[in-house]
């Protein structure tokens, strides 16, 4: 009597294997495009603020959308550099854009954190 085929145990929920190549119809392998996201950085900030708190993949997707949206809005304020006949957006233009885009207290916190980050960066050079 033939032995029943051994089946592999089902992978644990949430575990994902990195697939770098996908099989094409004609047998050739092609590289799968990489999706860029801010999830690594969002996770690092979360652990700095609340070390014992986790985040779901759905919430991470929302945070990624939020960061992309804010980035696009700040980049959209490039007219601030254009007014001064400049082709480069400096930290000053970004600061002004943040003040225009974010409401009240949120803008104040964002500006202070941004200033702190720029100061840390320039002092490390």
Curated annotation (Swiss-Prot):
Modified residues (N6-(beta-hydroxybutyryl)lysine): 6, 12, 21, 35, 116
Protein name in the entry: Histone H2B type 1
Organism: Rattus norvegicus (Rat)
Residue positions where N6-(2-hydroxyisobutyryl)lysine is found in the record: 6, 13, 21, 24-25, 35, 44, 47, 58, 85, 108, 116, 120
Reported modifications of this chain: Monoubiquitination at Lys-35 (H2BK34Ub) by the MSL1/MSL2 dimer is required for histone H3 'Lys-4' (H3K4me) and 'Lys-79' (H3K79me) methylation and transcription activation at specific gene loci, such as HOXA9 and MEIS1 loci. Similarly, monoubiquitination at Lys-120 (H2BK120Ub) by the RNF20/40 complex gives a specific tag for epigenetic transcriptional activation and is also prerequisite for histone H3 'Lys-4' and 'Lys-79' methylation. It also functions cooperatively with the FACT dimer to stimulate elongation by RNA polymerase II.
Modified residues (N6,N6-dimethyllysine): 58
Quaternary context: The nucleosome is a histone octamer containing two molecules each of H2A, H2B, H3 and H4 assembled in one H3-H4 heterotetramer and two H2A-H2B heterodimers. The octamer wraps approximately 147 bp of DNA.
Alphabetized UniProt keyword annotations: Acetylation, ADP-ribosylation, Antibiotic, Antimicrobial, Chromosome, DNA-binding, Glycoprotein, Hydroxylation, Isopeptide bond, Methylation, Nucleosome core, Nucleus, Phosphoprotein, Ubl conjugation
Dimethylated arginine modified-residue sites: 79
Modified residues (N6-methyllysine): 47, 108
Coarse class of the protein's main subcellular location: nucleus
């Amino acid at each position: 009597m033939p032995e029943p085929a051994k089946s592999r145990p089902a992978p644990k929920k949430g575990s994902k294997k990195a697939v770098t190549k996908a099989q094409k119809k004609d047998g050739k392998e092609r590289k799968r495009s990489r999706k860029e996201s801010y999830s690594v950085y969002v996770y690092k900030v979360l652990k700095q603020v609340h070390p014992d708190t986790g985040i779901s993949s759905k919430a991470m997707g929302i945070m990624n959308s939020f960061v992309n949206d804010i980035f696009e809005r700040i980049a959209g304020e490039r007219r601030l550099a254009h007014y001064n006949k400049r082709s480069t957006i400096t930290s000053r233009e970004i600061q002004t854009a943040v003040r225009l885009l974010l409401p009240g207290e949120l803008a104040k916190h964002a500006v202070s954190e941004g200033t702190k980050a720029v100061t840390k960066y320039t002092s490390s050079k």
